[in-house]
């Protein structure tokens, strides 16, 4: 089973992707994580990608498509995976379908712009285990101590400022809304209310995927 999580930045795709992937024992592949890993390398590709990220612009299709194809074909995912953040537009979707023949389920996270901004501005994660927190909605139970691993080192994303976030959301709308219309006619497109709390969203996704 291949499941695609669609939604704007801050919609909760990463949080739910990790949660659902663990429950059904499938890999969670997040395009954002892949590119952040590339950016940490000292290569011309990393510098090019980082320039787009800093300006709040989407990385060009030809770069995204090739990175994703190379990544997916370099591993054997016999039982499928959860793909988070790709495809983001119609061209990427058609490219994806050109080399992936398995049946796909698409889940779209519908969230208001105001809530998205708060989620992104407040977001940070444990450097050790990757657990995601939020200054507004989800703090560790003990100040500066990760609930999962006990680490006291956290990572705050440098590209998360309000001006860049608003631009990313607008760019996302322009790029991705035609893709939503495209998938609506596939028979495998589902919408979840991303404004609900984490547990409620997880339950909605489990119903769609028919898992307990």
UniProtKB/Swiss-Prot annotation:
Identify the stretch(es) annotated as NMP: 30-59
- Binding annotation for ATP: 10-15, 123, 132-133, 196
Binding-site residues for AMP, renumbered to this chain:
36, 57-59, 85-88, 92, 157, 168
**Entry EC number(s):** 2.7.4.3
- Coarse class of the protein's main subcellular location: cytoplasm
What InterPro entries is this protein classified in? Adenyl_kin_sub (IPR006259), Adenylat/UMP-CMP_kin (IPR000850), Adenylat_kinase_CS (IPR033690), Adenylate_kinase_lid-dom (IPR007862), ADK_active_lid_dom_sf (IPR036193), P-loop_NTPase (IPR027417)
Q: Which domain of life is it from?
A: Bacteria
Protein localization: Cytoplasm
What pathway does the annotation place this protein in? Purine metabolism; AMP biosynthesis via salvage pathway; AMP from ADP: step 1/1
Q: Which residues does Zn(2+) bind?
A: 126, 129, 146, 149
Catalysed reactions, semicolon-separated: AMP + ATP = 2 ADP
Its assembly, as annotated, is: Monomer.
Q: What is known of its domains?
A: Consists of three domains, a large central CORE domain and two small peripheral domains, NMPbind and LID, which undergo movements during catalysis. The LID domain closes over the site of phosphoryl transfer upon ATP binding. Assembling and dissambling the active center during each catalytic cycle provides an effective means to prevent ATP hydrolysis. Some bacteria have evolved a zinc-coordinating structure that stabilizes the LID domain.
Instruction: Name the protein family.
Output: Belongs to the adenylate kinase family.
**What name does the UniProt record give this protein?**
Adenylate kinase
The protein's organism comes out as Rickettsia rickettsii (strain Sheila Smith)
Q: What is the lineage of its organism?
A: Bacteria, Pseudomonadati, Pseudomonadota, Alphaproteobacteria, Rickettsiales
**Which gene is transcribed and translated to give this protein?**
adk
């Amino acid at each position: 089973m291949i499941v695609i999580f669609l939604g704007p930045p801050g919609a909760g795709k990463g949080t739910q992707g990790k949660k659902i992937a663990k429950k059904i024992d499938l890999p969670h592949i997040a395009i954002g994580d892949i590119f952040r890993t590339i950016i940490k390398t000292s290569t011309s590709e990393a510098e090019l990608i980082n320039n787009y990220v800093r300006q709040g612009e989407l990385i060009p299709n030809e770069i995204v498509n090739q990175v994703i194809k190379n990544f997916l074909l370099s591993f054997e995912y016999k039982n499928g995976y959860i793909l988070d953040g790709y495809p983001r537009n119609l061209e990427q979707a058609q490219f994806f379908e050109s080399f992936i023949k398995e049946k796909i389920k698409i889940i779209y996270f519908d969230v208001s712009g105001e809530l998205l901004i708060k989620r992104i501005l407040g977001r940070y994660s444990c450097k050790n285990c990757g657990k995601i927190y939020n200054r507004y909605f989800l703090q560790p139970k003990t100040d500066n101590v990760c609930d999962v691993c006990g680490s006291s080192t956290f990572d705050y994303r440098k590209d998360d400022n309000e001006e860049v976030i608003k631009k990313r959301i607008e760019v996302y709308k322009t790029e991705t809304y035609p893709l939503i219309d495209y998938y609506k006619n596939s028979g495998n497109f589902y919408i979840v209310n991303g404004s609900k709390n984490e547990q409620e969203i997880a339950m909605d996704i489990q119903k769609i995927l028919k898992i307990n």
